Swiss-Prot record:
Its main location: Golgi. It is an enzyme of class 2 (transferase). This is Galactose-3-O-sulfotransferase 3. Glycans are attached at residues 91, 110, 177, 302. PANTHER family: GALACTOSE-3-O-SULFOTRANSFERASE, GALACTOSE-3-O-SULFOTRANSFERASE 3. The chain crosses the membrane at residues 20-40. Belongs to the galactose-3-O-sulfotransferase family. Pathway: Protein modification; carbohydrate sulfation. It holds the Pfam family Gal-3-0_sulfotr. It comes from Mus musculus. Its cofactor is Mg(2+). GO terms for biological process: glycolipid biosynthetic process. Residues 421-431 have a biased composition (Low complexity). Residues 1-19 are cytoplasmic.
Amino acid sequence: MPPILQRLQQSTKMMSHRKILLLVLGCSTVSLLIHQGSQLSWYPKLFPLSCPPLRESPPRAKHMAVAFLKTHKTAGTTVQNILFRFAERHNLTVALPHPSCEHQFCYPRNFSAHFVHPATRPPHMLASHLRFDRAELERLMPPDTIYVTILREPAAMFESLFSYYNQYCPAFRRVPNASLETFLRAPEAYYRPGEHFAMFAHNTLAYDLGGDNERSPRDDAAYLAGLIRQVEEVFSLVMIAEYFDESLVLLRRLLAWDLDDVLYAKLNARAASSRLATIPEALARAARTWNALDAGLYDHFNATFWRRVARAGRACVEREARELREARQRLLRRCFGDEPVLRPAAQIRTKQLQPWQPSRKVDIMGYDLPSGGAGPTTEACLKLAMPEVQYSNYLLRKQKRRGGVRSRPESVLDNPPPRPIRALPRIPQGT
């Protein structure tokens, strides 16, 4: 072979080796960057798993003015407890009901600022049951208040309502053998619009949100669209009970709170023996048909919820939700032992943690503190699991004392047992 051809062949081989080497180095570099992508946030557009830190730098000030519309049978008691504990840690005033309203703001009447106990005004937060009235809430709350609520899938919610209020709602009491299936087979045979506690038997979500629960989207689609528009105008976040931890991640980010601020113990949960393990498909369809207004609300806000998660970065939200669950389990173990379990009220020794029982047919579960505990940690754990009525009573006494109404210090352990529901509350006179 001529010398010139030999030199050309050697040059070609060297170039091929360089290309191969560069290709290997390039692949290795890209592989390393992808591997580090979930930990490095230097180029978020290329690596979507790069998530914002839990604590912003510089940190935003935590938002203190929050109004939570506590809807019925939607995990609202757990959210309320989160807000109550945050308010206590930051010495905030929580709006609480006038004594004649008991522990709700004279529900099911439309909310009025007159229903708020004078010792708890002006408030930073509000989280007790009420029927939404925008004008009255804006009259009461600070101008920078962030409004939040929570919805639950209507079939599951209705099963819970039917079980929980079976002894109080006449429409449910009329049903033979307290059968949900019998009621949903012919709901008009048992339901009477406008009677005592009727709102628990038909479109309860719509009623809580201030809507007309007797309207049907099948007959008036414009009404549902208008109600959705009203909710969107007011509420910065509509949480979804089925995705509770993801909802708390969005809430934490909205309010610029820390992860520790949204840790929780599950409250007001029924025992397995008091609920259907699964709702048959036909029964779920019947429940959604009967509660069509609620179904329309839920379907819309469930869709907007996931669009919001997508904007925040679904992988990032899921990662933070996992971190929340892990931190929550550590907290529960520290407070309630290595294997914290929900217990029937009869097995809870600490009276302040015994949840109210709506009837003999329904067991509401709770936690108990290990014996021998004392000190700040015990008090924090007590509040973590404290039922709504006891916590509301405690906060009212504490805020009265802060306002000079009472001078004797109140103990967190000094809580009377909750009273049963008897009748509609009276309207308080004056302010």
